[in-house]
């Protein structure tokens, strides 16, 4: 067991598209020592005993009310480390899936501050958190594995 095991993060995230737009949810994050509102893909932590495709469906439903149709399609994985106060390190791995949803409009759930469809140009301007880099790289040219690190 690694020294990071107690704080590791395993996540599953949904890429939901409608035409040329992608669905994002608003969150409040601690970045660079301050609180910042970010636009993130719907998703979050995989719970104990949960499979990745189950987690992405649950998180999408909790955050937007949308229901996944069928099995999500794997797109890419991002992993890295996050260094927080006092130099503690946390390893994280996030899996991203294209999902098809049952018809309906997304509505912000209790865990998020809002929902918004972003165009490619809006994504380039709005996605500024360090962990957004891999998604933007994937959009620009593909790839299936990305590594990054960030510091609070």
Where are these regions (language model features)?
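Short helix-loop capping/hinge motifs at secondary-structure junctions, enriched
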Residues: 22, 103-107
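Short, well-ordered beta-strand micro-motif
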Residues: 16, 96-100, 116-119
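Active-site segment of metal-dependent pyrophosphate-handling enzymes
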Residues: 65-103
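Conserved Nudix-box catalytic region and its N-terminal flanking loop in Nudix hydrolases
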Residues: 21-62
